[in-house]
Amino acid sequence: MLQQAGHRVYVAESAVRHLCRLSSAVERCFTVPSPRHETENYLLEMERLVQAWEIELLIPMCEEVFYIAQGTERLGDHCRVLVSSIEQLHELHHKYDFIQLAESLGLSVPDTRLINSRQEWLEAQPVLEMEGEWVWKPVYSRFAARVRMPISSTADFDGGASDKKRYRGNMKQYRLQNGPPGDVEISVASPWVAQAYVAGQMLCTYSVAYEGKIVAHTTYDSRYRTGSVGASVFFEHVEHEGVYEWVRKFVHATGFSGQIGFDFIETEDGQLYAIECNPRATSGIHLFHPGDGLVRALIAPYEDELEKETKVVTPKQGSKAMLMLPMLGSVLQQLWGKGSLGAWITAWRGTRDVVYQRHDVKPWFEQFAVVLSAWRLARKHKLSLTEALTHDIEWNGEQR
């Protein structure tokens, strides 16, 4: 979109293989040090590139935003940087601090408890299980990595046993599968949260904000994922006034500027609960098309109607997108799980692949090399494929 709007696009990436590497929409790609593992060298190289190529706007696209935010003082001397402060980003990224903030603003969120150690986990777990079902996850995580979902109380572990006996069997199974992480994985510096499980439909958002005002927004259905609770691979724009109002109030109250996303659960009776915040670009960006106005929202949000919030840029009604390869993988869940193959086929038909572009096909072939590279890294470091894809850029609260 940026290139089609007449802008020159330069990409700085720490991974050797990435989708933009061969794209005809990119003027030039640069390989930079890992933001996570070589933060100072990364920021030095970014500053050099910004100066050398006279970059006017720097747009972080994933968790490198947290490292860029730590270098805004030096980078901001040379170009506009589309980030908020590192202090604000940290608060929103931290899964417990975000919940506390949203609750203080009077916005609906699930009951969420902070767990700082294995001992706290062991003490809290039996008490919480008496109250209901809980989701356990690290406060610093992304794409549902390491999330532990509760085992359904209706799963038939004990065959024809009574409901009461079957429920007890479930809880025993849940305890066996939900032992505390190792001491290295959970600590005061890297705690977990236990969040009350809310049954309902998952809805996600992507917004561009400027000084507390939304200038671009989409709410989207993300019903197909990698695994049962993994990263989204299918995105469909939906109009949802309740979600938009929740996001608008939050952005206004915090004065946020930059790209931001939220994950919501909507219950059967229409109650909305925000469960996480992603203070960065999310997959909802794929739902915008050239001409929708997103480029203007990113580059010049302070102009006229956008600044006054008289017009919020949104995707066209019915806009859909998917990541084709992992979407194909999700069909197995429909065949062997609880999904509907017919619904999956309906979703597939007429949905564009975000990687494939008829006039720019090289990124489509490059994705196989990207996956292979991530698979090798995953094997080497004993990571999931999703974790391997963000291994060099993820941020877990570290400060320079």
Role assignments for model-derived ranges:
Residues 252-287:
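Conserved metal-phosphate-binding beta-hairpin within the catalytic cores
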Residues 152, 158-229, 236-245, 266-273:
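Phosphate-binding site of ATP-dependent enzymes
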Residues 8-10, 109, 192:
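Hydrophobic anchor at the start of a short beta-strand
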Residues 296-400:
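Peripheral (often C-terminal) accessory segments that flank ATP-dependent C-N-forming ligase machineries
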Residues 102, 126-147, 186-200, 217-221:
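ATP-grasp fold ATP-binding core
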Residues 143-144, 223-234, 278-291:
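Glycine-rich phosphate/pyrophosphate-binding beta-alpha loops
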Residues 1-84, 119:
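ATP-binding N-terminal substructure of ATP-dependent carboxylate-amine bond-forming enzymes
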Residues 79, 87-112, 122-127:
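Glycine-/Pro-rich loop/turn segments that contact NAD(P) or position catalytic residues
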